Amino acid sequence: MGRVEDMGLNAKLMKLETELFDYQYNMGLLLIEKKEWTSKFEELQQVYTETKDALKQEQEAHLIAISDAEKREENLTKALGVEKQCVLDLEKALRDMRSDYAEIKFTSDSKLAEASALITKVEEKSLEVESKLHSADAKLAELSRKGSDIERKSHELEARESALRRERLALNAEREALTDNISRQREDLREWERKLQEDEERLAEVRRLLNQREERANENDRLYQQKQSELDGEQKKIEIIMVSLKNKEDDISSRIAKLNIKEKEADAVKHSLEVKEKDLTEFEQKLNAREQSEIQKLLDEHKAILEVKKQSFEMEMDKRKNDFENDLQNRAVEVEKKEVEVKHLEAKLAKREHALDQKHEKLKEKEQYLASKLQDLNEREKSMKLEENKIEDERNQLLSDKQEMLCLKAEIEKDRASTEEQRLKLSEEIERLKITEEERLELARLQSELKQEIENCRHQRELLLKEEDELKQEKMRFEKEWEDLDERRTALMKDLKDITVQKENFEKLKHSEEDRLNNKKLDTESYVQKELDALRLTKDSFAATMEHEKAVLAERTSSEKKQMLNDFELWKRELETKLFNEREDMENALRLREKQFDEEREKELNNINYIKEVISKEREDIKLERSRIAKEKQEILMHQKHLDEQHVVMQKDIGQLVSLSEKLKDQREQFFKERECFIRFVESQKSCKNCGEMTSEFVVSDLQSLAELENLKALSVPQLAENYLRQDLQGTPDKNLSTVTPGAVGLGSPASGGTKSWLQKCTSKIFIFSASKKNNSPDQNTSRRLHVEASPNKLLNTEVIPELPSGVAGETLEMQNMQVSNSNREMESNLNLSGTEQSNIDSKALDVEDSQQSDVRAGNRKPGKRAKGRVRRKRSAKEVAEEAKTVLADPIELNENEHSNGLASAYTNESRGDSSLVGKRTRNSRKRNPSQPSQSAAGDVGADSEGHSDSVTAGGRQKRRRKVVPAVQAPTGRYNLRRHKTAAPLVANGALSDPNKGKEKEIDDGGGIGEEIPDEVDGNTHLVQVTTLKKRINVVNEFSSAGFHGINATSESQDRDAANQLVSDTMLSEEVNGTPEQSRGYQNQGDTSGAEGEDEDGDEVEHPGEVSMRKKVWKFLTT
């Protein structure tokens, strides 16, 4: 029996071990599967995180792109505002222009009303189209809310947005080009209007000539034909402009069609996104439904299984409990009866107890082994805790068995008297109990499996909950991104609206330009009609041939009008057809959009399976974009390097400018040195006997003013030089900058005609700031610049010829008196400085002859007068003739008291005001031919400048005349004895003045110059001096030929040219009464002193011949 029990226990133990090994094997398989699932889960998590990072980067890039787009939109809006302001300014200017032509517009009001009605119709149609577009946009907005899968399509959207931006930039560039073309066309039209105004002026002149002279009818006809040809050309130009405008409209319509196509593509993409969004939502709902249904199924199945097992287990346990209780009761009765039998079995029980103890120890060892394994399993996974609980249950069961065995031991000790039959029964009962224990173990195992399944279900439930949370988070993110995309979409819609507004503005501008062109056409037609009417009125006196030609011209103009009207109507019809076609195109485009939307919906339903491939492609696109961004960064770096190089080049240019400024400072210092040398030279002249008085007076009157100039801080030489250079750099006109190179005797060749030295510019600028010239305008100062040589000796030897102001026929008598009184002194000083070997006795012997010649000169001498800053005005021939008549009608009145004493103080006050050294010379600036520097250089001998002009005596002999410069002019009064003609420029040494160089001027230091009268024949000006005293001129000529050695070479050729022309006093009167046309043109060329006498219209006017004769006789007697 003991062996059987041992064998049963061993079998049970083997079974338990096999079950444990199976359990461990199953747990290992579960752990391996768990590891595989965890590895897969980690991989999926990594992929998910990577996709999240990529999406974040793409979103950031997209936000940056949107911000850039917004900035560009702001800049575009600002540019549009500026353009609108420009358009408003242009419209204001157009309104001002149209106000001038208000009378002409009354005839075209009906046509304009029709055009406005058409425009209103077109605007109503456009409003209808816009309403339809708004409804379509609303539908699109409703559909756009359902878009999905934007993360996958963001790259495509960005690419398309960049393409749209490029196209917008291209459109802006084209719009700017169109505006430039329109502005150019406007400028052309303005030029055309200017030409029309000039034609009107010409017509007015022609009418006046027709009223005066009927002999010029043929010329008027020719002018009319020319104007007709010009009008034909203008009409052709207008037609060309209309053709170009039509071409531009075609280009704009093609571009609008392209934009519509691109909008359709964008709408198709939006539809596809919306379809994908719908599919995703449906897929999510399906997943949620599946998850819930599967979870519910699993739970229901598990619950049903558990309930069935629980019911069966409870039934079995209840049955066994009842059986066991009955058995125990029977056993207790039987144990009491069989105590005797139990005593016999004590030994056997002791042996069995010993065996059980050994088995218990083995079980303990196995329990320890299992505990170690359970600890390892607990460390690896929490699921092993369930197994430990099972083992603990088994332990509890074993302990309960032990307790039962102890109870049995007690019972056996009490029932030693039990019999062997009872022992057999007990053994049978023990076997039954073993069977129940096995069943209990099986139940425990089943319970553990159920617990494991429950835990697995819980784990799966947790995973599903986590997945649901993740899906919810993804859904939230997706919604956020969708909102961002909605915002972007709204921004794009705003852009499209802005583009439509710009289109409308452009169309409005186009219509306005068309209206303006039509108005201009009507204005030109009406202008032509007016001109034709005026010509008809003027040609009523002509023959029937002129009337026939007028009829022909009227028929031509009427045919042209009809053609213009027909063209205008055709153009209107074309515009209406274009608008109708555009509306049909828009409707067709909407239909196509709807069809494309349906097609793309079907396509996107099929494309859901290929989302993974799209993700991989998008990753590749991201890589390509990153490489592109890196390339762009490299390009930006290269551009920065290029900018740095340009910055270095600019720094080099700045260094060069600094070096130039230093050179200018050095030149300033050189100028100071030269000025000091000049002052030393003037001081050295004081020691001369003959010219000592002149130099002393010069020092007292002029050098003191120079010292005052030096003391002035505001008028320092460097500042004046810098200001002068700034004025030159700021772009003074070429006419004012043109200079004349004076010649110097024996002092080298003069400077080139078109250049100026820095010293010359500075000296001219300094000499302008005299006290008497503060009231002059800056235009006079710039037009009267000095050309001074680099050394003081050259400056002294420079010959300067004054330019008489235009419009002034005579000068004051007081000035002429003082010139006569100082002529002897000038002759003596110049003869001493010229280096001739005449003695003082010869000079005394020739004193009378010098005075006679000075008298002859004084009659015609015109000292230069400062030109006032007046605005020149062009005068017609009638005005000139009327002024000449008034001048001749006025009596010539001379005040003898003013000749003697009265006006001396007035002139001294004015002469004292001229404080600079060369300020006196700038007063009498003249025009000069720069082609004669060598001739003038041969005639300069003394310290001061001298000049020679041809004088013709009554007998026809050629005489040389010498210009003498006084050292100091005595104060005299000032009159404005004005001749209404232009005075010819006086040129030294007999050089002929060039009428084409009317802006070149030189400086005279106030010396007396004989009056010279322009006799313009074939465009050349010959200088003729009217003289009446033959003996005096002969004596002076002999004296001048004996006294001057260096002037013969240059004066002979000039005397030959001047000797051929003899002019009498009557020519002077003729020139005063009627000015030739050439002199009138020369007057209009621009003499700054032409309007000097406008403030002094009340002064007396003298006849030049009469004044010269009386003055000559009186001066001869006084000297």
UniProtKB/Swiss-Prot annotation:
Keywords: Coiled coil, Nucleus
Basic residues bias: start-end ranges: 859-876, 920-929
Location of the protein in the cell: Nucleus matrix; Nucleus lamina
Disulfide bonds: none
Region feature Disordered, mapped onto this chain: 846-884, 903-974, 989-1015, 1046-1109
GO cellular component, as recorded: nuclear lamina; nuclear matrix
Comp. bias regions, Polar residues: 1075-1085
Gene Ontology process terms (BP): nucleus organization
Domain of life: Eukaryota
Coiled coil ranges: 140-226, 328-488
Family matches, as InterPro entries: CRWN
Primary localisation category: nucleus
Record function comment: Architectural component of nuclear structure that plays different roles in controlling nuclear size and morphology.
Family of the protein in this entry: Belongs to the CRWN family.
PANTHER family in UniProt: PROTEIN CROWDED NUCLEI 1, PROTEIN CROWDED NUCLEI 4
Protein name: Nuclear matrix constituent protein 1
Protein species of origin: Daucus carota subsp. sativus (Carrot)
